[in-house]
Structure formats: C-alpha cells, structure tokens
C-alpha cells in the first residue's frame, strides 16, 4: 500500500484523485488544505487542515508531515518552488515528490525568463512583450504595442492562475456592457491609477492581446514517449481536443530542450491563425481530467506510477473530439 499526499490544491484536484484511484485502488490518499470544507476532502482517506506558512517554513512543515505520516508520494501545488528547493531532503526521507527540480520551477515561474529561453532555443513563437516596474514605462509599452497590435493586456510576472491578468479596454461602458463580464477588463486610466498606488511595483509583463483560441496541452514524458493532449478552450464549457501539427511539434521540441520529468501544462493562444506559446506550468492543469477523458489516458495515474518506478502502459486515442463537464453535488 502506497500513501500519496496532496497539499493545498485547487478544487478540481478532486478529479485528479479519482483518476489516481482508478489507476490503482490500493493507494491511500491524504489531503490537506487551509479550507476545512474543500471538496477534495470527499475523495481522501485522511484529511488535515494546513497551517498558514510560506517559503522555507512551509517546506519544513511538509518534511515533518511526510515523516510523521509515512508519505511515499508527495504531490505539491502550494509553495511548489519552496518544496522543490528542498528536494534532496525529501529524497533522503524516501519521499518521491511530483515536482521538477528547482531551476525549472524558477525558470517557468518567470514568464520573461521563459520567453527568453524559448527564443534562444528556437521553440515555437512567443509574443512581443515589455517588462515594466513603473507607470512611465507601462505607458510607453502600451503605446508601442497598441499601435502595432491594437488591443493590449498585462499581468504580474509572479502570478498563478492568471489572477492579475487584465485586458485594457478604453471603450465607454454603456448599456450593452451590463450583459458582459467585466472582471478582466480595465481602462488605461484605471490601470495607471491602480499601479501608481505602489510604484515602483512588482514586475509587470505588458503584451499584445491574442484574440484567437486558447489551447492547453497536458503533457507527461514517459518511458514509452511523450503524452501531449491539446485542449482548445473558449468561453463555453465545451472544449475540443485537436492535434494541431505546429503545436504538437512545438511541444516535442520543448521536451528535447527541457526534459521535464513530471506532468506539466503548456499553454498557447492564436493570433491570425498562428499559435504563440503563452506559458508553461510545472504542474498538472485544473482541467487535466478533460484531456484524460477525451484521449483515454490517465495522466495522474501514469505519473504516480512513474515516481514509484513503474512504467505503466498507456495508449493515446488521437481522435479529435469534444469534451465537457457538469457540476455534481459533493457532500462534505
């Protein structure tokens, strides 16, 4: 019996745990979270509340937790960088950690560094961008990009899940705007006013808005080759698994240059029919279960087996198909 621990994950890890159980019902799963009523609790064998710690202190907590509970596989999301810094200490305990070595976590946690690496190694296409820390440079970047591309967006370099992402929209808000979600839209004036409150501010990446389809590719390198399942996302709940040759080639070249061992997610967005690399997340995506369902591949299960030294057989059904999800009640 192997014991698997998932720390503070987003709620869709509910599906990741179910996939792990599907691959081997003998696994025991521990979940921890700051939120006592996280839906993940419903699919865990054991459940504990996490302390509110950061950085090295949090990594120390994780080491102690692994030691006390006899954890075999640790799947971190919270403070992944801090955990990966201490990878040697986890390995000394005999704990397999589903995280990349720290240099990769740091590289792909910084979009500016990642874009520079992609350009240096000729991996796909990346958008033009400016890095700014004051409103003067922000305005210069906006003017240069808007003249060339039209619409401009920005986000903080240190961000997860796109929480700071904003699209600059200077159109007057009228009656029609009441029927549209405005949470990611902000005028240039509003953006400048907000950024002035903490100037110089944390690095912000300013780039053209790419209006085409967003493609999320769930990936895992295995002993049998690369699993790469691209999901085309739009504003609806219906996603399409579509194997674009350029995207698949870019993913293959990415793994040749950066041999990541753990599950990751590579995101693209289209502009004028051309896919641009947006970012690489060194963890499973929140929608990995959609890819698994469409392609018939259990990425979480294969990844756990890989950490345990098992080369699990898999076969990817590359039929292009639509996939969606529905809300289900979860009693906590």
Which residues are covered by each model-predicted region?
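Residue-level detector of structured alpha->beta connecting loops
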Residues: 70, 94, 149-150, 259
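Short, charged, surface-exposed secondary-structure boundary motifs
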Residues: 40-42, 58-60, 106-112, 162-163, ...
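ATP-dependent carboxylate activation and anion-phosphoryl transfer catalytic cores
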Residues: 7, 69, 237-249, 253-332
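Phosphate-binding site of ATP-dependent enzymes
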Residues: 178-254, 258, 269-270, 274-276
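Active-site nucleotide/adenylate-binding loops and adjacent lid/helix of ATP-dependent enzymes
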Residues: 105-203, 223
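ATP-binding N-terminal substructure of ATP-dependent carboxylate-amine bond-forming enzymes
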Residues: 1-101
């Amino acid at each position: 019996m192997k014991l698997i621990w998932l720390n503070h994950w987003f709620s869709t890890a509910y599906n990741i745990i179910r996939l792990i159980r599907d691959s081997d019902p003998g696994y025991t799963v521990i979940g921890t979270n700051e939120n006592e009523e996280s839906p993940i609790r419903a699919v865990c064998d054991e459940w504990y509340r996490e302390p509110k710690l950061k950085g090295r202190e949090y990594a120390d907590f994780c080491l102690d937790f692994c030691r006390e509970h006899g954890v075999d596989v640790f799947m971190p999301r919270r403070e992944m960088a801090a955990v990966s810094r201490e990878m040697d200490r986890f390995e000394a305990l005999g704990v397999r950690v589903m995280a990349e070595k720290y240099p990769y976590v740091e590289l792909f946690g910084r979009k500016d560094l990642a874009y520079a690496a992609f350009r240096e190694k000729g991996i796909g296409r990346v958008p033009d961008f400016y890095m700014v820390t004051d409103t003067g440079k922000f305005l210069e970047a906006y003017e240069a990009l808007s003249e060339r591309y039209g619409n401009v967006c920005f986000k903080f370099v240190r961000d997860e899940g796109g929480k700071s992402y904003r699209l600059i929209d200077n159109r007057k808000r009228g009656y029609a705007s009441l029927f549209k979600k405005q949470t990611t839209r902000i005028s240039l004036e509003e953006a400048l006013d907000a950024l002035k409150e903490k100037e110089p501010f944390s690095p912000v990446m300013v780039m053209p808005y790419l209006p085409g389809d967003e493609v999320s590719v769930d990936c895992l390198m295995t002993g049998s080759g690369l699993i790469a399942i691209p999901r085309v996302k739009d504003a609806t709940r219906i996603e399409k698994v579509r194997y674009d040759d350029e995207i698949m080639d870019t993913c293959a070249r990415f793994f040749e240059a950066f041999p990541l061992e753990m599950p990751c997610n590579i995101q693209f967005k289209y502009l004028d029919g051309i896919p641009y690399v947006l970012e690489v997340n060194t963890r499973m995506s929140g929608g990995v279960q959609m890819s698994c369902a469409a392609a018939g591949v259990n990425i979480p299960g294969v990844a756990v087996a890989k950490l345990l030294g098992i080369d699990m057989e898999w076969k990817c059904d590359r039929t292009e198909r639509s996939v969606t999800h529905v809300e289900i009640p979860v009693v906590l």
